[in-house]
Amino acid sequence: MIDLVGLFSRTPKDPDLKNNIKKYKEFKKLLKEKKYAEALKSGTELLRKVPHHHDALFMVGSIYYLKNKYGTAITFFDRSLEIGEYDIDVLLLKAYSHQKLSENKRAIQCCEKIKEIDPKNKPVQQLLTELDL
């Protein structure tokens, strides 16, 4: 089935918007309460219904980051960046994930992109220092 996308939107319109907003709020609440296992399940279910939900992709990736599953986190960060390619928070966690996997070249690429957006970003400067640059 082909989903048609709106004229100015990169994502398809959500046919079950009210229910998905409710699920998103539940997901955020679980995350805020640090119930990561439940939040991960809730976020994954939400992404099955709304696969292009930028914030949910970032938050699920963040949970995987906290669980030290950096490769899995990066896949969610990449999907999130397909929607919002200049999201500094996503880029920064992706850079940290690459650093944890000793993929310094990729971490540097993320840092360079952040510097294009925010040249004075302190976490990026610190990360680049840690990477000996």
Where are these regions (language model features)?
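Canonical positions in the second alpha-helix
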Residues: 45-46, 79-80, 113-114
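Alpha-helical segment of the N-proximal tetratricopeptide repeat
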Residues: 16-55, 66
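Register position in tetratricopeptide repeats
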Residues: 32-33, 66-67, 100, 130-133
